[in-house]
Amino acid sequence: MNLHEYQAKALLQRYGVNVPRSQVAETAQAAVEAARALEGDAWVVKAQVHAGGRGKAGGVKLVRTLDEVQDIAVSLLGKRLVTYQNAPDGQPVEKVLVEATLPIARELYVSMLVDRSLERVVLVASAAGGMEIEEIAKDSPEKILQEVCDPLNGLVDYQARNIAFALGLVGDQVAAFTRLAKGLYRLFKENDLALLEINPLIVTAEGALVALDCKMSVDDNALYRRRELAEQRDWSQDDAKEAEAHNAGLNYIALNGNIGCMVNGAGLAMATMDLIKLHGGAPANFLDVGGGATATTVARAFKIILADPNVKAILVNIFGGIMRCDIIAEGIITAVKEVGIEIPVVVRLEGTNVELGRKMLSESGLSIISAAGLTDAAQQAVAAVKV
């Protein structure tokens, strides 16, 4: 679950990290009042969307008059911002962050993330802040600094100081960075974050360290114990189908292909998508109905898949263990009747009550393609979209 910049900065402040003075606004007039309250002779107006690349897309603007604040707010609020990181139709801008400007001497990069190969939280930093870290890692990997955090001891002072010295910080800045880094580690651990990224972390003309921009992502699997954070979720930023799937207890991720997939089990779902690609097709989604789905849930899953206009065929791949094949068959029949599916549906069933499930499908009178195995199912689905 992603947080907006203003939400992330509020968390940073709780852990002693300096952020610019700012106010959130939902209307152009509120943006003007925010700038007036912040005072100064220049402000930055930032669109609040869950995507990077806002600056290049026109979502971050430096303004010097209150009239400009209003004009930029009007141009952003109620519109959709398209960046290289989000969907082709962009994401809605419902709020802007009006921020006081600061004199910048240097721009740094700092983040906390989970290195899955090491199974550790890692502090990552670079003196090349304000740039895309992926490009830095690719073109100049020597500029990426890392310290691996021990799960028992956490991030210790000497590790933070090592990074500070490598970044070229001096004097009081070293102690300030050490406090900041240890605060970030506590924030990361205590809030079950999956990613915490400050880019840039600036050094002001006075030598202070300030988080100018921040990205935070909370581990979805921990939201049950992070109620305060879960309540901050902005569903308008998520794919509508993904939001509906979440409410239905389904694991759904939209992709760019044209073959809809409904599978039980994440591993089997990924294997199914691999086979579709292997045989020349492109999956339109990842959808795991899990082991406890009902016929109603399966029908709802069909509706979510069909909400994607790019879907030209659907492949249902079920290995019945906890999930019984007759339940899946009932859901398929219900969905086809309710939604009026007019595209090919390829079904591969194996496992618990498979014969009953196949019988239900064959006697339903519906146009459903039965597959003998997973490879056959993938081949038939790919062939169906090419007709």
From Swiss-Prot:
Keyword terms of this UniProt record: ATP-binding, Ligase, Magnesium, Metal-binding, Nucleotide-binding, Tricarboxylic acid cycle
InterPro entries in alphabetical order: ATP-grasp (IPR011761), ATP-grasp_succ-CoA_synth-type (IPR013650), ATP_grasp_subdomain_1 (IPR013815), Succ-CoA_synthase_bsu_CS (IPR017866), SUCC_ACL_C (IPR005811), Succ_CoA_ligase-like_bsu (IPR005809), Succinyl-CoA_synth-like (IPR016102)
Residues the entry annotates as binding ATP: K46, G53, R54, G55, E99, L102, E107
GO cellular component, one term: succinate-CoA ligase complex
Tree of life domain: Bacteria
Signal peptide (from-to): none
Annotated positions binding substrate: N264, G321, I322, M323
Known catalytic reactions: succinate + ATP + CoA = succinyl-CoA + ADP + phosphate; GTP + succinate + CoA = succinyl-CoA + GDP + phosphate
Cofactor(s) needed: Mg(2+)
Binding note for cofactor: Binds 1 Mg(2+) ion per subunit.
GO biological process: succinyl-CoA metabolic process; tricarboxylic acid cycle
Domain ATP-grasp positions: 9-244
Pathway as given in its UniProt record: Carbohydrate metabolism; tricarboxylic acid cycle; succinate from succinyl-CoA (ligase route): step 1/1
Entry-linked SUPFAM superfamilies: Glutathione synthetase ATP-binding domain-like, Succinyl-CoA synthetase domains
Residue positions binding Mg(2+): N199, D213
EC number: 6.2.1.5
PROSITE patterns associated with the record: ATP_GRASP, SUCCINYL_COA_LIG_3
GO MF term set: ATP binding; magnesium ion binding; succinate-CoA ligase (ADP-forming) activity; succinate-CoA ligase (GDP-forming) activity
Keyword tRNA-binding found: no
Disulfide linkage: none
Family, similarity comment: Belongs to the succinate/malate CoA ligase beta subunit family.
Function: Succinyl-CoA synthetase functions in the citric acid cycle (TCA), coupling the hydrolysis of succinyl-CoA to the synthesis of either ATP or GTP and thus represents the only step of substrate-level phosphorylation in the TCA. The beta subunit provides nucleotide specificity of the enzyme and binds the substrate succinate, while the binding sites for coenzyme A and phosphate are found in the alpha subunit.
NCBIfam families: PRK00696.1 (NF001913), sucCoAbeta (TIGR01016)
Subunit structure: Heterotetramer of two alpha and two beta subunits.
Name of the protein: Succinate--CoA ligase [ADP-forming] subunit beta
Species of provenance: Methylobacillus flagellatus (strain ATCC 51484 / DSM 6875 / VKM B-1610 / KT)
